[in-house]
């Protein structure tokens, strides 16, 4: 079998940040890297899960809600994938920065945390998600589209 594109990225050189992973037709996949792979400890699942709920809810309620395809964690627990269509890289970056700021200061009930709404509703960590978001917001605060290339 051929090696898939995501396995051709030099993970030993990746730093925290936000990168354009691939473009397929009109869909852009962003790599929101919160950890240096194989260097830093990976994220905890509860924090990942809560950040996923809050980020997805935020972006799907933004002015770009019709341009959001997907947001979710990487299996390696070193980041997230964010898929969009029909928006610029600058808008995707700003939306990500805004979502992270929203999560870092979030108070209240996390959307979708019940047995009816979520497949693993017991595995959530709001404080952990807030810390992850604040840390990544700090990384991205001066990030530009020029920084988004692997």
Describe each model-derived feature in a short phrase.
Residues 120-144:
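Short, low-order "capping/linker" segments at domain edges
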Residues 68-101:
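M16 family metallopeptidases and their MPP-like homologs
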Residues 27-60, 70-71:
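Active/ligand-binding-proximal structured segments within catalytic/core domains
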Residues 53-64, 98-101, 105:
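Short, intrinsically disordered, mixed-charge
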Residues 148-150:
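Sequence termini and other peripheral, non-core segments
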Residues 1-29, 60-73, 77-81, 143-146:
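Non-catalytic beta-strand/loop surface segments
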Residues 104-121:
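Conserved short beta-strand edge segments in small beta-sheet-based binding/regulatory domains
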Residues 42-50, 92-104:
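Extended Gly/Ser/Thr-rich low-complexity repeat segments
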């Amino acid at each position: 079998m051929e090696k898939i594109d995501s396995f051709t990225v030099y993970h030993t050189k990746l730093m925290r940040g936000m990168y354009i992973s691939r473009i397929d037709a009109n869909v852009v996949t962003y790599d929101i890297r919160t950890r240096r792979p194989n260097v830093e400890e990976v994220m905890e699942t509860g924090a990942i899960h809560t950040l996923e709920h809050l980020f997805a809810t935020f972006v799907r309620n933004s002015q770009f809600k019709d341009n959001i395809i997907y947001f979710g964690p990487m299996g390696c627990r070193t980041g997230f994938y964010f898929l969009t269509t029909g928006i610029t890289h600058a808008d995707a970056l700003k939306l990500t920065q805004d979502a992270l700021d929203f999560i870092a200061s979030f108070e209240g009930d996390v959307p979708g945390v019940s047995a009816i709404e979520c497949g693993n509703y017991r595995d959530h960590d709001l404080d952990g998600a807030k810390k992850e978001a604040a840390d990544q917001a700090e990384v991205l605060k001066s990030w530009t589209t020029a920084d988004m290339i692997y």
